[in-house]
Amino acid sequence: MLNRENKTAITRKGMVSNRLNKFSIRKYTVGTASILVGTTLIFGLGNQEAKAAESTNKELNEATTSASDNQSSDKVDMQQLNQEDNTKNDNQKEMVSSQGNETTSNGNKLIEKESVQSTTGNKVEVSTAKSDEQASPKSTNEDLNTKQTISNQEALQPDLQENKSVVNVQPTNEENKKVDAKTESTTLNVKSDAIKSNDETLVDNNSNSNNENNADIILPKSTAPKRLNTRMRIAAVQPSSTEAKNVNDLITSNTTLTVVDADKNNKIVPAQDYLSLKSQITVDDKVKSGDYFTIKYSDTVQVYGLNPEDIKNIGDIKDPNNGETIATAKHDTANNLITYTFTDYVDRFNSVQMGINYSIYMDADTIPVSKNDVEFNVTIGNTTTKTTANIQYPDYVVNEKNSIGSAFTETVSHVGNKENPGYYKQTIYVNPSENSLTNAKLKVQAYHSSYPNNIGQINKDVTDIKIYQVPKGYTLNKGYDVNTKELTDVTNQYLQKITYGDNNSAVIDFGNADSAYVVMVNTKFQYTNSESPTLVQMATLSSTGNKSVSTGNALGFTNNQSGGAGQEVYKIGNYVWEDTNKNGVQELGEKGVGNVTVTVFDNNTNTKVGEAVTKEDGSYLIPNLPNGDYRVEFSNLPKGYEVTPSKQGNNEELDSNGLSSVITVNGKDNLSADLGIYKPKYNLGDYVWEDTNKNGIQDQDEKGISGVTVTLKDENGNVLKTVTTDADGKYKFTDLDNGNYKVEFTTPEGYTPTTVTSGSDIEKDSNGLTTTGVINGADNMTLDSGFYKTPKYNLGNYVWEDTNKDGKQDSTEKGISGVTVTLKNENGEVLQTTKTDKDGKYQFTGLENGTYKVEFETPSGYTPTQVGSGTDEGIDSNGTSTTGVIKDKDNDTIDSGFYKPTYNLGDYVWEDTNKNGVQDKDEKGISGVTVTLKDENDKVLKTVTTDENGKYQFTDLNNGTYKVEFETPSGYTPTSVTSGNDTEKDSNGLTTTGVIKDADNMTLDSGFYKTPKYSLGDYVWYDSNKDGKQDSTEKGIKDVKVTLLNEKGEVIGTTKTDENGKYCFDNLDSGKYKVIFEKPAGLTQTVTNTTEDDKDADGGEVDVTITDHDDFTLDNGYFEEDTSDSDSDSDSDSDSDSDSDSDSDSDSDSDSDSDSDSDSDSDSDSDSDSDSDSDSDSDSDSDSDSDSDSDSDSDSDSDSDSDSDSDSDSDSDSDSDSDSDSDSDSDSDSDSDSDSDSDSDSDSDSDSDSDSDSDSDSDSDSDSDSDSDSDSDSDSDSDSDSDSDSDSDAGKHTPVKPMSTTKDHHNKAKALPETGSENNGSNNATLFGGLFAALGSLLLFGRRKKQNK
């Protein structure tokens, strides 16, 4: 029988306070998800432990029976929860497990060194103290069998009322009813010399029972359920009279270590299965207080959870009868070692025996993947016990490409603490298969309909979510022990992609994912003061194109047990339950009944020895009863209940004892006094299923239909109740009296009723839509109804843009979205209306066989294409209205095509490399050319540029006439227009007209060829003979600056001649340019335009026109003035030349004219000197030649006047007038040859310094040349002026530059007129001649000088 007062398991042979010590986690099945048991959980309850499945051992079966802590166990799938290691009791209702066979021994009672004087209560025999110890003065011991009075309260601290806490036994105090992890444990009566099962763990918290300090429980990182211990202090070990020592050699143990396959699937999984450690330990009497023994376990074993507040603790071993601590525990986590230190209990008692019954766990930290022959071992004292197991982790949950796995990995709970209810963590593996997922989303939800008392919660205020990306190829720990240092924290990337819902859920949007992710959910518990809360959390992964996949985790409770010897007093108790099926036997699903009074009498004396009231769960417990016969009576039954039959079946622990029964206490608790009661009400209902084969009979593979409405009516047709079928298709009307009822089933949408009453099994056939049910002293669960899905079909297909208007769907043609499509029946009634999606698809669903009419609305701006083109009805157009027939299958052939009634205009701009005006195959397009479209009124409609292939296109054009203008690309010239007969290949020029008439016009082309580029330049040379012609021996002048200007006078280029005197300007278009040569320092411009263009000098500035060819005729020459004359005068003359230099004066030529005079010729004076050498004859005549110099001066007429004698000479010298031509003056040089006097004249040359002045004033010299030499001397003084003139006055002496040429397109130089004289030197020479002639006249004839005009 089950005692629901303390959730303890009571047998006729004894009692175990399993409510105190044992809670278990079960593998829950939630919906279609496989909820793997994560890690263990304990909600702040005393010394409770959590494990995956509760252990059962046949050898301990008779000793104790434990009951689960889960008060709401009837709301969970107990088939999944209660999977024991050996047997499963069908009558277990709340995670009940049988443990151990305990044999009763009447001998070897404990011998106490000091007897304890009781104050009140019944007397109980106890053992005497060890023989070598003196008795206490208060002892009444007479011998080993001396009786001693011990009060019930001393023997067992709590009474019945004190056991209101699940775990803790406290004094009667309402404020102590809540769970407190630091209160004392319930004591048990176990013989010290005959403990076989030791099914209870008694934890000494060394604290006053009134201290409230709820335990914080934390789960390990591993998914394996691990032992959890409540918060407590290690019991202080009193110093012994002798030095403490290791007494492993004085400890003997009988130990079993068994791998428990909780779900019996022959697969050992750390997350679900566990190890059962049971040991009976005998302590040698030589052991003293302070001595210790050890329990060592392998690194593959996890003894308890990693609660940071409990890490150092493990349960002490106590005497369950009096609560005394036998040994205190200390855990060395680094070395997997538990050290138990004995208290003075071993000094006062002999033959101490202890029992350990632990569920310990496989450490997934050291077993990261599936592995065979994993060894587990535990060494108690000096005895090692081993076992092995093949570890096989479950695969991830996979559906198509979606995959997921999860586990609880940590939890801390504070039951009853509103401010800090605790927290828990769940680790989720997302896409561990590393598939490529589209629109992947993870939903985490702390809810499941089967677990309404779930205390998990998820919301943005209390939940923290971390997301880690797993490297490709990385192997995740199957035990969910995650090393985040090896992963990439991507939490920040997803903060804005986490959405919290109102139903304790969060959705993480991963988008497109092709790697695995680890999601760690850290959140707080909801506040609870429940003694049996549950935690369930689901995780669901969805992605586009794949079925979603779910997993989840649920937590329950268990506890490990240890115990030692105690006083022999016992308990009576068990359970009052509602026997819903009235069979007198406790069964799963039947609930306890509270507030029933239970009274116990000594059957021999009829004395009342105890009384209790059943708790809400129906349990009760009456403690402190010695061996004897007792009468148990139940009273105060709830109104309307009747007593179920008693003594049904062969199991006295599960049957009903009736209202009064006599039971016996004999050496152990008797937990068999139960009472079953029931309400005389009945149920009616059964099942609604999908009859897939339509045979009217429920077959094994046919499933229920959920959500079907079922109505219950009385015989008169009045509606009594309405229910809907559950997820399995079940329905039930409860609390019904005997009578006739009418049941009506509503046909679920999309289904058709199956055939009725097929076959002879009324529990398997279908009763149809309406049936009658009779209740007559029993439930009627035979009313079923079957349905099969009404066949439905789809009709639809595609609306597309038929760009080529051929009425057929081509692969490049796209759908048209938003087109309205209407479905009508044969009578023209509208059934459905839809619109095409973004791809042009549409579909009408849920249609039955029949003929339908489909109408397409022509989209705006489109025209229907031709209908029925081709033979493939799947790709042709059915027009805007068509008929579709459905006959036992979908019809996906109804299409409609449309096109836009607009056209395109354009074609091509190409580089016409051969300039023939026709597109040739090897000629390519020109990109980036601007093309403008105008209407007939010259209004710009559109502008485009040609693409990389030279193509252009104007789209969406109506019929009409258009003007197209092409902009000439930079560096190109339009080619010839309309060459050839092919309008698609020729060039339409820069402007053309295009006509659109119901078709595209793609014939408007324009060709261009690259505009030719030309070069300009030639040569600057040293004209050593000053003839203005390039001779083969004359060399180029380097570094002469040459500047190029465009027609606007803007500088477009500057260069310098190279070492050969060459220069060049490249990349020039046809056009007008100006070339300016910068005169080199110290050089004089040579004469220009003396010969053909490519050999002559063109002067300092040249205008040139380039037309379709290069021009390499632009040359210029310079020479260096000769300064070899002894006469400084010639220098002064050369000064005048230097003046002319600035304008590249041809004066130098005129100077060369006066070869007769060595004076003014700066360059050819040396010639005049040589001339003077050649002439020895009539100087006077030759002087007249010097007059002829005046001829070189255009003033020569006046000179000839001054020379009456030599007029004829001067006339002949008039040839020297040609000196003004600057070339013919060389003839006058020969004149000077006749002037051999010029030696003496050369003196006069020094006088003729005045000539240098006369340079500045070519006619002042004509004034009385013979005025006097002194005058001319003064002139020579003024010569110094001419010296200054040489550089600064050149402009004054030559107002127009001596040589400025303009070239026509043949580059022929034209002379420009001068306002001054080009032959200053020649004038000077003439002046000298005139002066000498005048002087001669004065001396010989006394004549005045002639005035030159």
Curated annotation (Swiss-Prot):
Q: Which GO terms describe its biological process?
A: cell adhesion
One GO CC term of this entry? extracellular region
Pfam families from the UniProt entry:
Big_8, Gram_pos_anchor, SdrD_B, SdrG_C_C, YSIRK_signal
List where Polar residues composition bias occurs. 62-71, 94-108, 146-155, 163-173, 860-869, 972-981
Enumerate composition-biased segments (Basic and acidic residues). 130-145, 174-183
Q: Which residues form the propeptide?
A: 1316-1349
Q: Which residues carry this modification: Pentaglycyl murein peptidoglycan amidated threonine?
A: T1315
- What domain of life? Bacteria
Cite the residue spans of the region called Disordered.
54-185, 856-883, 972-992, 1081-1325
Location in the cell reads: Secreted, Cell wall
Instruction: Please give the name of this protein.
Output: Serine-aspartate repeat-containing protein D
Organism of this sequence: Staphylococcus aureus (strain NCTC 8325 / PS 47)
Q: Encoded by which gene?
A: sdrD
